[in-house]
Amino acid sequence: MRIFLSTLGVLFLMSFLFIMPAVLGPSTTPQPSTSPVLSAAPTPSPAAAQEIRAVWVSFLEWQHTDFSSESAFRADAAAIMQNIASLGANTVFAHVRPFGDALYPSRYFPFSHLCTGTQGQDPGFDPLAVLVETAHAQGLTLEAWINPYRLQANGTPAELCAQSPALLHPNWVKHTATGLYLDPASIKVQQYLADSIRELCTNYAIDGIHFDDYFYPTTAPDFDADSYAASGSTISLADWRRQNVNDLMRACYAAAHAFNVRFGVSPQGTLSGCRDGQYSDAALWLAKPGYCDYLIPQLYWGLNYRKNGSDALSLGRLAAEWLSLPRTESVQLAFGLGAYRIGDGDEGDTSGPGSEWCTGHALATQATTLRSLGASGAALYRYAFLFANTLYPTLAEQEIAALREVWG
């Protein structure tokens, strides 16, 4: 965690920084800086390693959060943070930039449609400032969860405003059948994203920057055939795509570390899915410094998972595979657990009423197992399936109680 000095001068400075975003204004349209993308990554890690006990709060939670006023949002945010702290968790991954839009005033991205229903519309207060304050009040660290490339997916948001990068910089955008994405190959995009991280770290007392598993949205060659051809690269398309993501990782790591802020990623649960599905070279990021401070692969299957008799995707098998990889000392390796599986199961051979997901202690047992294997901790996806579970409220309450025994 970042170390905060309890002097009046620092408190005054932090208060000033919370106010700064309001003067930036989302109407300003900066160009990416001319600083090199691949700047040297400082070491060591900005935070002393401790067990990661985290909860994701996604844009889906924000859809049920009251943004009508600062006081209403503050009440909801405080309740969320209090609940998370009650688990014995120490970290919140708060979704603050889900679709090329932001839960804070930014020079680079418009206000999110989640704040008012209309992308680009100012809610009249700064949601991220409230999230940081309410998290820290509960002794939690707050990491800003960002989707770097995604601008629109499956019709969300329904309309993009004039300040969306999709409209401001159409030559930076790639299309799929279901969405719009920033071009991972574009040096300008990489610089723009790194600059936006500098903005976050300058204006807020965040403890980390967090990416999830949304990198390349497709394996289709025509997604970026023009960019690949223009690059003149002699390496394969797949290796070229991985190189583009690696370049972004190094740039964002360096940007965060310049402010002593952690930078981490939650990639897909299988190494093949990472490497060949989304072109994220997670094994490299684990093995070499300068890419991230932690990885949290998403292992959303149970310990007893079997599919057609195979346990290849069981949590224990996958965790052991990840833990056997070469790992540099500065990178933690924790794992994401699927709280959304409570009651429903993981679609395995034994999924259903008799499965581990109906015991009331699936997540606690998984977290304990990961701890015994030497993992750096666990993160739970996602908040609502524990604290707003209308389908399986009793099971969710039992899972919460069991987690408190493990994390408390």
PLM region descriptions:
Residues 104-117, 150-177, 213-233, 350-355:
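Aromatic- and acidic-residue-enriched segments that line the glycan-binding/catalytic groove
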Residues 87-123:
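Aromatic-lined carbohydrate-binding/catalytic grooves of carbohydrate-active enzymes
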